[in-house]
Amino acid sequence: MSQSVSERTRIKSDRYESGVIPYAKMGYWDASYTVQDTDVLALFRITPQPGVDPVEAAAAVAGESSTATWTVVWTDLLTACERYRAKAYRVDPVPNTTDQYFAFIAYECDLFEEGSLANLTASIIGNVFGFKAVAALRLEDMRIPYAYLKTFQGPATGIVVERERLNKYGAPLLGATVKPKLGLSGKNYGRVVYEGLKGGLDFLKDDENINSQPFMRWRERFLYCLEGINRASAATGEVKGSYLNITAATMEEVYKRADYAKQIGSVIVIIDLVMGYTAIQSAAIWARDNDMLLHLHRAGNSTYARQKNHGINFRVICKWMRMSGVDHIHAGTVVGKLEGDPLMIKGFYDVLRLTTLDVNLPYGIFFDMSWASLRKCMPVASGGIHCGQMHQLIHYLGDDVVLQFGGGTIGHPDGIQAGATANRVALEAMVLARNEGADYFNPQVGPQILREAAKKCGPLQTALDLWKDISFNYTSTDTADFAETPTANV
């Protein structure tokens, strides 16, 4: 016997509630949820629109970054909805604010394709940042579970193997970015590489926007750089290198340049963050297959990482890039010309260098996390640093870092080689003093160590006279929520 329309409607209503329902009532908020070891966890800084309850805003973010749309859909009945819904399980007010909240959200691991950063980010940051229920939204931190991490390759080389290849231990590595970064001919570019390496640097590097322009095509640059590397290595007896930028318009062209770099003897190439997550992972797989180091310039990151209330915190980018498989990434200097709160920078470096992360709120680390045996990623400090800051750089950044003095090498009045020598002597003098127990970070002691070293090194004395104690101390935009730091109160 056929059922009446009213009877069918009654049965449907018993099984399924249609229409627009608050996200919190649809299962995207669960204060009693027990976090599972296999969950992907995300911490968002939420600024709800006026009149929007913080819990509802958190649930909305959870819903829109997982399975929800604006209305209930009957096809929910065809899925394991309870399992696949992301669950906001905790909302805390952000210290020292009146309209911001930390929302903790758990995602079932099966929501994400294995080993695909593009798929992970398509959910976590794909749609929710334009959602009307929130006035601003920032992804502050993530916990990637062991099971999901193991589907990513991580850095192919890592810090330990890179040091073995260079035969350099117990101190930062030294580098410089060729300046001016645009306009040099290939021959002059190669000369800069040679002079810097011969003067004592371990690396020179292409900058983010030197690719293949009319004034210097990529093949010309690669050949002259390798000539400079080989001559400097022969003259010094040290392993040297220069990061060759293979960033291009298509992956076909990226691979073409990468293959050529390998063929002529390069050991390291560089790509830019603006290439995109799929391109970065593809380049990392190529680097692993070809036994090459992969350096990542974070070009473009501050368009979404710098503002405190909206975007993506750079510590999350650090996690994603370590998962993707880059060996180096620019991660801040504290004392240079670019954004860099000391506690935030230390948090970035911990994310890249530690095997296990513990909750450290002053550093902005909200989750315990094991790196599941993925290799460590070498942080790079670059942008407005010079040898007179060596005591500060070593104190803040430690040993496992590449210190890149671009202008601080090439801007030396006596030439590029002299600038490189000044940096090398300053580094070795400071490391030696530290190892002997000196209070090198003391503002009276550190500069004096450099002055003593300069008595036997003319290039260092010239550099100290030129740049003195210049630093770029501005109030940081992105500061710790749970501690005050010096640059936040300049």
From Swiss-Prot:
Protein purpose: RuBisCO catalyzes two reactions: the carboxylation of D-ribulose 1,5-bisphosphate, the primary event in carbon dioxide fixation, as well as the oxidative fragmentation of the pentose substrate in the photorespiration process. Both reactions occur simultaneously and in competition at the same active site.
UniProt organism field: Trieres chinensis (Marine centric diatom)
Residues annotated to bind substrate: 127, 177, 181, 298, 330, 382
Other notes on this protein? The basic functional RuBisCO is composed of a large chain homodimer in a 'head-to-tail' conformation. In form I RuBisCO this homodimer is arranged in a barrel-like tetramer with the small subunits forming a tetrameric 'cap' on each end of the 'barrel'.
Q: Describe its assembly.
A: Heterohexadecamer of 8 large chains and 8 small chains.
Name the record gives this protein: Ribulose bisphosphate carboxylase large chain
Q: Please, which domain of life does this record's source organism belong to? A: Eukaryota
Signal peptide annotation: none
Q: Which family does it belong to?
A: Belongs to the RuBisCO large chain family. Type I subfamily.
EC category name: lyase
Q: Where is the catalytic site?
A: 179 (proton acceptor), 297 (proton acceptor)
Using the UniProt record, give the first listed, main subcellular location: plastid
Q: Which gene encodes it?
A: rbcL
- N6-carboxylysine: modified positions: 205
